[in-house]
A protein has these predicted regions:
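Residue-level detector of intrinsically disordered, flexible termini
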Residues: 2-5, 11, 20, 60-61, ...
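Feature targets compositionally biased, intrinsically disordered low-complexity regions
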Residues: 8-12, 21, 30, 78, ...
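A periodicity- and composition-biased signal for non-globular, repetitive helical segments
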Residues: 10, 55, 103, 146, ...
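A generic structural signal for ordered secondary structure
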Residues: 34-36, 80, 147-151
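Unchanged
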Residues: 52-141
């Protein structure tokens, strides 16, 4: 296979770095933890997340994005779950995205998907159901870690 020629010109060879934060939202339902999953406009299932605003901490961004994308309030931060990263191309440019996920708890059930941002559905699911729905392996691993954190918190308290 012939070697590809290097791109030249403005922005060639540069990777755009993006930092996001999101929430693994959990709610207690009759003694069982249920997790919030959202569906985007591409029909992919995952978690609420988005870019950090200027001067905003990752924790604050995670809480803001969860509230904006799902309509939930009464959100309680439980701490960092994991940081994942991935690469993708957008308009011909390579993007390296880093996303910090936090465990967030709520007592509220009713959600309101933010359709203007491409959120087409919100669902509360058990770990097993959420894990089966989630579209990406790295997000599934974050869910597993969040579930482990909830179990550790229950057994310790």
């Amino acid at each position: 296979m012939p070697a590809r020629r290097a791109r030249t010109g403005k922005g060639a060879g540069r990777t755009r770095e993006e930092v996001s934060a999101g929430g693994i939202v959990v709610r207690r339902n009759s003694g069982t933890d249920v997790f919030l999953v959202i569906r985007d406009s591409y029909s992919n299932w995952g978690f609420p997340k988005g870019h950090l605003e200027k001067g905003e901490t990752a924790e604050a961004a995670a809480l803001r994005e969860v509230a904006e994308e799902t309509g939930l309030s009464d959100l309680r931060m439980h701490g960092a779950v994991d940081t994942i990263d991935w690469y993708f191309r957008f308009r011909g440019r390579l993007v390296h995205k880093v996303c910090h996920f936090f465990l967030i708890e709520t007592d509220l059930e009713a959600t309101s998907p933010q359709r203007e941002e491409g959120i087409t559905a919100c669902r509360w699911e058990t770990f097993e159901e959420a894990s089966a729905l989630i579209s990406y392996d790295n997000a599934r691993a974050v869910l597993r870690r969040a579930a482990e954190m909830m179990q550790a918190g229950q057994s310790g308290g």
